[in-house]
Curated annotation (Swiss-Prot):
Belongs to the class I-like SAM-binding methyltransferase superfamily. MenG/UbiE family. Pfam families: Ubie_methyltran (PF01209). S-adenosyl-L-methionine binds at residues 74, 94, 122-123, 139. This is Ubiquinone/menaquinone biosynthesis C-methyltransferase UbiE. The keyword Repeat does not apply. It comes from Cereibacter sphaeroides (strain ATCC 17025 / ATH 2.4.3). Methyltransferase required for the conversion of demethylmenaquinol (DMKH2) to menaquinol (MKH2) and the conversion of 2-polyprenyl-6-methoxy-1,4-benzoquinol (DDMQH2) to 2-polyprenyl-3-methyl-6-methoxy-1,4-benzoquinol (DMQH2). It is an enzyme of class 2 (transferase). NCBIfam families: MenG_MenH_UbiE, PRK00216.1-3, PRK00216.1-5. InterPro entries: SAM-dependent_MTases_sf (IPR029063), UbiE/COQ5_MeTrFase (IPR004033), UbiE/COQ5_MeTrFase_CS (IPR023576).
C-alpha cells in the first residue's frame, strides 16, 4: 500500500485518505464557482474586501513584478495586485477549471486579460520552474490543500531569491468567548446561506469545518519557517478571525 492511500487527512471534520481529498475539494469548488464571490460578501458582510485591501497594503506591489496567485480562483487577489503595480503580470493557478472560467470572464470585462495567465495546477506540485516569481499569494485557499507543508515548500521553490510569500487565511480568535460566538455564527448561519444562495449546504458546511481544522497563527508561522522562509511575521485581522502571514525567500 502506498503512502497516498495509507495516510489520512481531514476533509472538514471527516477523516479521509490523502489521495481522496483533492478530488473532494475540487468537487466543492466546482459546485460553488458561480456563486463564490457573492457568498464571500454574504458570509463576511463584505469584510473580506477590507482584509484583501490590508493584504495589498502590506504586500506593497511594485511595477513589473511577476505574481503567482495560487488557489486564485476568480482572480480577486490578482486584479487587486495588478491595479497597484503598472507593468506587473499575474499567473492565477487553481485546480478547479470552473473557478478559472469565472476569473477569465472577469478579466475580459475589466480589460485586463493581457496581464493574466490562467493555469490549472496543484499547489503541492506547481507546474512552474524554480526561481520564477517575485511574489506568491494564496488567499483562503491553503487550508484546503491536502498537505499544507508541501504547498509551502513549493512556494519557496518557485519564488526568486528575495521573493515574498503572503498568505491570507481564516484563523483562530485568541479570546475563547469570542471564538465561541464566532463558531455559533459559522456553524449555524453560513451553511444555511449556502443552501439559500447556492443551493449547496454541504459545501459550505465543509468550508466552515475546514476553518476550525486549520492551525493557529503561531503554528502556521512555524510551518512557513520550516519551508525555508525568513523574516516570518503575521498580522491578525478582525481580532483574529483572519490572519495575514508574510515570509521572504532569503
Amino acid at each position: 500500500m502506498n503512502d497516498e492511500t495509507s495516510n489520512t487527512t481531514h476533509f472538514g471534520f471527516r477523516t479521509v485518505p490523502e489521495g481522496e481529498k483533492a478530488g473532494m475539494v475540487h468537487g466543492v469548488f466546482t459546485r460553488v464557482a458561480s456563486k463564490y464571490d457573492i457568498m464571500n460578501d454574504l458570509m463576511s458582510g463584505g469584510i473580506h474586501r477590507l482584509w484583501k485591501d490590508a493584504m495589498m497594503d502590506w504586500l506593497a506591489p511594485r511595477p513589473g513584478q511577476k505574481l503567482l496567485d495560487v488557489a486564485g480562483g476568480t482572480g480577486d487577489i490578482s486584479f487587486r495586485f495588478l491595479k497597484r503595480a503598472p507593468g506587473a503580470h499575474a499567473t492565477v493557478c487553481d485546480m478547479t477549471e470552473s473557478m478559472l472560467v469565472e476569473g477569465r470572464q472577469r478579466a475580459d470585462a475589466a480589460q485586463m486579460a493581457d496581464r493574466l495567465d490562467w493555469v490549472v495546477g496543484d499547489a503541492m506540485a506547481l507546474p512552474f520552474a524554480s526561481n520564477t516569481f517575485d511574489v506568491y499569494t494564496i488567499s483562503f485557499g491553503i487550508r484546503n490543500v491536502t498537505r499544507v507543508q508541501d504547498a509551502l515548500n513549493e512556494a519557496f521553490r518557485v519564488l526568486k531569491p528575495g521573493g515574498r510569500l503572503m498568505v491570507l487565511e481564516f484563523s483562530q480568535l485568541p479570546n475563547p468567548a469570542m471564538q465561541w460566538a464566532y463558531d455559533r455564527y459559522s456553524f449555524n448561519v453560513i451553511p444555511v446561506m449556502g443552501q439559500i444562495v447556492a443551493n449547496d449546504r454541504d459545501s459550505y458546511q465543509y468550508l466552515v469545518e475546514s476553518i476550525r481544522k486549520f492551525p493557529d497563527q503561531e503554528t502556521f508561522a512555524g510551518m512557513i519557517r520550516k519551508a525555508g522562509f525568513g523574516l516570518v511575521k503575521y498580522r491578525n485581522l478582525s481580532m483574529g478571525i483572519a490572519a495575514l502571514h508574510s515570509g521572504w525567500k532569503i
